């Protein structure tokens, strides 16, 4: 099982993840991505889904038109792990390629 990050490690990781913050009221990190339109938002989700499936680590997310709200946590560990940080980095890289606002 993957080990949950300490508070200090989680805060340090968040400093290196633009747009991400601690999720309110739970042991998780969150970010809202805003894209040009629905097609771009859905394209982002499709690309992330491929990575998530490959690593067997799936986000909690919600899509409304051009907005994708994401929450990452590792349920088995009861909080944020390196797997969440890695997926957040991948999401930021994909979003940067698609030029979100």
From Swiss-Prot:
Cystine crosslinks: none
EC number(s) given by UniProt: 4.2.1.96
GO molecular function: 4-alpha-hydroxytetrahydrobiopterin dehydratase activity
Biological processes annotated in GO: tetrahydrobiopterin biosynthetic process
Top class in the EC scheme: lyase
CDD domains: PCD_DCoH_subfamily_b
One Pfam match: Pterin_4a
Organism: Rhodopseudomonas palustris (strain BisB18)
Protein name as it appears in the record: Putative pterin-4-alpha-carbinolamine dehydratase
Catalytic activity reported: (4aS,6R)-4a-hydroxy-L-erythro-5,6,7,8-tetrahydrobiopterin = (6R)-L-erythro-6,7-dihydrobiopterin + H2O
Keywords: Lyase
Superkingdom of source: Bacteria
InterPro entries registered for this protein in UniProt: PCD_sf, Pterin_deHydtase
Family named by the database record: Belongs to the pterin-4-alpha-carbinolamine dehydratase family.
């Amino acid at each position: 099982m993957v080990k949950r990050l300490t508070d200090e490690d989680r805060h340090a990781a968040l400093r290196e993840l633009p747009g991400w913050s601690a999720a309110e009221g739970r042991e998780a990190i969150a970010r809202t991505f805003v894209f040009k339109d629905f097609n771009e938002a859905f394209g982002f989700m499709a690309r992330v889904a491929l990575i998530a499936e490959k690593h067997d680590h799936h986000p909690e997310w919600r899509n409304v038109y051009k907005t994708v709200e994401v929450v990452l946590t590792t349920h088995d560990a009861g909080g944020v792990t390196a797997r969440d940080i890695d997926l957040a980095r991948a999401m930021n890289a994909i979003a940067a390629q698609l030029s979100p606002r």
